[in-house]
């Protein structure tokens, strides 16, 4: 899901837009694989992040890349970096 390094670079992740009903904000669903502590099986986990979309360009179903940023509101700590793939209508 995330790539961390000691240089302080911003983390970027790719996910799917699940909501664009808010003004200049999108909800992005992120999938990641996590190894179960006891059994060792890899399990798919999901997280939902709110991201800032200044131009309201992302739509539901789009695959987007979001970048970590300073806190913009109570729940918004990500910003839209680019739309990787548009939704098929």
From Swiss-Prot:
SUPFAM superfamilies: Nucleic acid-binding proteins. Signal peptide: none annotated. Keywords: Ribonucleoprotein, Ribosomal protein, RNA-binding, rRNA-binding. GO terms for cellular component: cytosolic small ribosomal subunit. It comes from the Bacteria. The keyword Zinc does not apply. Belongs to the universal ribosomal protein uS17 family. One of the primary rRNA binding proteins, it binds specifically to the 5'-end of 16S ribosomal RNA. PANTHER family: 40S RIBOSOMAL PROTEIN S11 FAMILY MEMBER, SMALL RIBOSOMAL SUBUNIT PROTEIN US17M. Part of the 30S ribosomal subunit. This is Small ribosomal subunit protein uS17. It comes from Bdellovibrio bacteriovorus (strain ATCC 15356 / DSM 50701 / NCIMB 9529 / HD100). The gene is rpsQ.
């Amino acid at each position: 899901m995330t790539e961390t390094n000691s240089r302080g670079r911003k983390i970027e992740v790719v996910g799917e837009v699940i909501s664009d009903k808010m003004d200049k904000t999108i909800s992005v669903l992120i999938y990641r694989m996590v190894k179960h502590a006891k059994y060792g099986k890899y399990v798919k986990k999901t997280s939902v992040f709110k991201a800032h979309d200044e131009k309201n360009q992302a739509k539901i179903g789009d695959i987007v890349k979001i970048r970590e940023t300073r806190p913009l509101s109570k729940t918004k700590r990500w910003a839209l970096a680019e739309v990787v793939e548009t939704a098929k209508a």
